[in-house]
């Protein structure tokens, strides 16, 4: 059992983007900053939703206090999240699947650059 305790500090409903924006406090005395995965799992469990709809934007730790604040976006549908969230956030939250998405995006970008170079010549 970890020495972390979580608490939802604030919830904001963003109907335009079909998501909820949460501010989650993590108290972790004498322990390291909680991982994105542990925050995602806790939020998904608390809200009773699938973990694929939860994305941690950032975790900010207060030096020497054993307390962190995490900004979390919870989407109604994971397909909407993949369109709205930046690729680097997807890569950080989805692990291997996110890294594959990032690599595919880099390949597409490089292909576009090559195409532009060929047109200029």
UniProtKB/Swiss-Prot annotation:
UniProt KW Transferase keyword: no
GO cellular component: ribonucleoprotein complex; ribosome
Keywords associated with the record: Ribonucleoprotein, Ribosomal protein
Protein name: Small ribosomal subunit protein eS24
Residue ranges that the Swiss-Prot or TrEMBL entry lists as coiled coil: none
Originating organism: Pyrobaculum aerophilum (strain ATCC 51768 / DSM 7523 / JCM 9630 / CIP 104966 / NBRC 100827 / IM2)
Lineage, opening ranks: Archaea, Thermoproteota, Thermoprotei, Thermoproteales, Thermoproteaceae
Family of the protein in this entry: Belongs to the eukaryotic ribosomal protein eS24 family.
Superkingdom of source: Archaea
GO molecular function: structural constituent of ribosome
Gene3D superfamilies linked to this entry: 3.30.70.3370
GO biological process terms on file: translation
The keyword Nucleus belongs to this UniProt entry's keyword annotation: no
Matches recorded under Pfam families: Ribosomal_S24e (PF01282)
